[in-house]
Swiss-Prot record:
Name of this chain's protein: Acyl-[acyl-carrier-protein]--UDP-N-acetylglucosamine O-acyltransferase
Enzyme class: transferase
Reactions it catalyzes: a (3R)-hydroxyacyl-[ACP] + UDP-N-acetyl-alpha-D-glucosamine = a UDP-3-O-[(3R)-3-hydroxyacyl]-N-acetyl-alpha-D-glucosamine + holo-[ACP]
GO cellular component: cytoplasm; membrane
EC number: 2.3.1.129
Protein's cellular compartments: Cytoplasm
Pathway annotation: Glycolipid biosynthesis; lipid IV(A) biosynthesis; lipid IV(A) from (3R)-3-hydroxytetradecanoyl-[acyl-carrier-protein] and UDP-N-acetyl-alpha-D-glucosamine: step 1/6
Keywords: Acyltransferase, Cytoplasm, Lipid A biosynthesis, Lipid biosynthesis, Lipid metabolism, Repeat, Transferase
Subunit structure: Homotrimer.
Family: Belongs to the transferase hexapeptide repeat family. LpxA subfamily.
Protein's organism: Pseudomonas savastanoi pv. phaseolicola (strain 1448A / Race 6)
Amino acid sequence: MSLIDPRAIIDPTVILADNVEVGPWSIIGAGVEIGEGTVVGPHVVLKGPTRIGKHNRIYQFSSVGEDTPDLKYKGEETRLVIGDHNVIREGVTIHRGTVQDRAETTLGDHNLIMAYAHIGHDSVIGNHVILVNNTALAGHVHVDDWAILSGFTLVHQFCHIGAHSFSGMGTAIGKDVPAFVTVFGNPAEARSMNFEGMRRRGFSEEAIHALRRAYKTVYRQGLTIAQAAADLAEPAAQFPEVAVFLQSIQTSTRGIIR
């Protein structure tokens, strides 16, 4: 049984699973579907088409599933898909997609989106991602699993943030961030790798040392990307972690931060 505050406004087409809670003065529009155990706090606005999974918590003053302000958007039906076990804190804004891309913005599972963060249209957020307060993602941004973007990080449209990467506070990202790399500054510069995060997540010391050597190959030896990639082929075959790092470099479309 769901617990709906009588002061909430819910469109009759909304689909609510069991044990959903909706707080006072929240507005849930047509085309929204909410999974079991999700809690929608007070003063939240949800607009469809939006599908929200199980056991999420959305805090007050968040706007989730609103139309994109992208000038290409002409009212086409687009959607937002949110997975399970996400925490969306106060004042977060998440926009639906555009038909010029996938027509879908996606947020995976077990993510923490902190206060006043923004996720732009057509962005794809993986799992276990943390967006700290006031981080803003432009449209078409991809953020891979376990990335952490510190407060006031700004990400240009179409950038790709690699798995396990980390940005310092106030970083302005205009190119792709390879997996595991830490970036700081405006404009962003690569400083090291997220070794502390790797240890917390149980990476072996052998894998960490291999990634350290791979980082030096790309960032400290004055090689071109093609030359560095050739040098990393052998360690990538030995260590899956190095293969992930190498793939994030080779598949970059905007060029990597160096």
